[in-house]
């Protein structure tokens, strides 16, 4: 009996010790995570010195930060969310002027999950909703005075839950919910059938090209088709209006089939923007938004679709490199989005390059046909009035290399409106270009503006354009930018397609009469009054005009990314030919399914290559931890220019440990007591900040209408205002730095993070990101533009090799960032997870050269959140210009050990340089505003850290005690059993 009792105690202690160890591990893990997110935890708890107490009130609209001023601000913020939708919603289709609705058309029925459960934003890092204030389409309709069919709403509420909405499932309700009793209600609410169509994807997950039903995710799914068929068959609705709640350009070739009357693209409206879109429906607001992407009849018709997603390396007998399994190759070159559709259209009209062949067709019935391939062009949008455009004058200032187009817009309708002036250009496509693989888009955006034009009135506006935008990058011949000889055409129009038709009419005259068509296939004549011509002064190709950087004349612009081209690495039998308009049929991309990892490629994929330079300085060559006669604090550096020698004295006060504090991001940067620098919080994201306000009701920060909407406003003022409102949000949340905006190019309509980027066009993103960043700086917020660059898909994003040619890199993908980083006010840039070619972006010396040398960029550089992933190398990243490690406090420790163990002065110099950038940037934010001199940094750890450490000790001690008790009882059991056996043996 005693033995059984003892064994029972042992088993109990075994269970208790196991539970205690598990709990201790959970507590330790929680502590680790909390410390990694220190900035966010401090921010949430309002810890003094963690970004919650420094001033910056001079940046606020009211000149103060208080509960009272917050109440005024938050009202203005939500009003601006609605304004984003008012100016960014795009009227794509309006048969027989179905919109705006009359005041008598107020009895309506809503259809589609998106009407009651829309996609407000992606689920990437960013703002959370404030449920009491968010607005669905139904909410916005009811607020606007519409009588919404309650029977249908009740049917949705009681219906079986639909399939989860995901990147591979639309998640629409089963149309079986429309029973006879439900459809009987249609007659009383038959003024309008509103159908909301939604698509969802997010960080880490691209939209599936083929969904769970085996269909393209951007075509109508069966349940959606059933909804439209139900509406059509009922015969009860006077109008059918579609609200397109998708940032992904959906296939829209079915409108006639279902008798749709109007389509309003509302994108992802954020949590509070939908009322603005409904004001467009009612006519309270005249629509003025224009598309930022091409809406194709078949969403896989772009040449990029042939090489999107994951393609596997073939390592053969070699051991695969860490995070080196996959690649993607941009074989389409510069022909992204409208550059493909419009260029192929011109060549089809002019009979060039076999453009009318069937190769690459997805929707055409007999050879490539623009009207069958495209539903709505890039830059297109309708209004409730009509505008006529004339390009009155084109001036060129050679001193500033700037073109100025003077454009008159006449409102010939009976409604006041906002007219978007889109200026496009066409460069000559020459024999030199063909011989040197220089590609030319038939039309490219150059600039834009937006103006109010009263009914019956005319307004004149000027649009300035850098002459540099007309240059083309020649990676083969000149190895730099070139300006071809010949005529350059400038044109305005309602989108790229209309502008191109205007150019063709001016350039070709009678030769194209009867051949030009709009997206519906209607013959058009083109407007030659909307075109101006400039003849380049050079009689042969000019390879010198843009030889040196326009931002830093001491730096020559030449090939930097030869090794980003797949042909640099591929075996001869796997080399590719980039798409060329000289031969559409033979160069149209095919899928590069695999790539053999030869020795050259295998060595290139190895990221762990850092070796201390033979001539590296010694750590002893540097003065660290110097005690100056008069201490220089953080606040003493306010207003000190970046190149002022005072920075040397300031930085010399810091020890190596002090220097490394700034370089480890824990959703913020810790305080540095040595110079009395406070800690700060850093937050995501492009759709709104994942933080809470520190004033008023302490609600979540604002979830704005997302960046495709901001782009679709085509309004510099609204885009700047977006940055300012975002920055004001940050002031009331005590946040000086944010990871926003996003500026990657929408190479494919299936890109998972479309909601965080502006456009398929690098020039539109150039201007929009520049304006947003400027607005943020106006409010003391450092925007961190991301993800630099070639980060156009989520599949395999950590470690994927992204291959592209240098012309596409410079004219498309880097240009989207150039406005904010080289021209604008951004002092932050985040590199991408992917490799540029085979080199991880944050360790790519070419990126540092572009940013620091060519663009003369003076801000900080941060990697994306790798957290010690194997394919990255901390010293390689540091030497390539990375200044701070995102969500990673381990890397600075690694750097410290490497510097001290190897006496590596080169690494130390990079650490000092990084701190120079980081301190300078922080001082340009609200951290360097009023009240900075009053901050006192304490050695004391925040109370929550002390508490967690105490809990760690307690639970670890309990776990150890439980294990000890288990061991003791187990030993006692064994000892007792031995004694029992000995007694039994003696009896025998």
Regions found by a protein language model. Name each.
Residues 467-542:
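Terminal connector regions
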Residues 1-474, 482-492, 496, 545-988:
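Glycoside hydrolase catalytic-domain context in secreted enzymes
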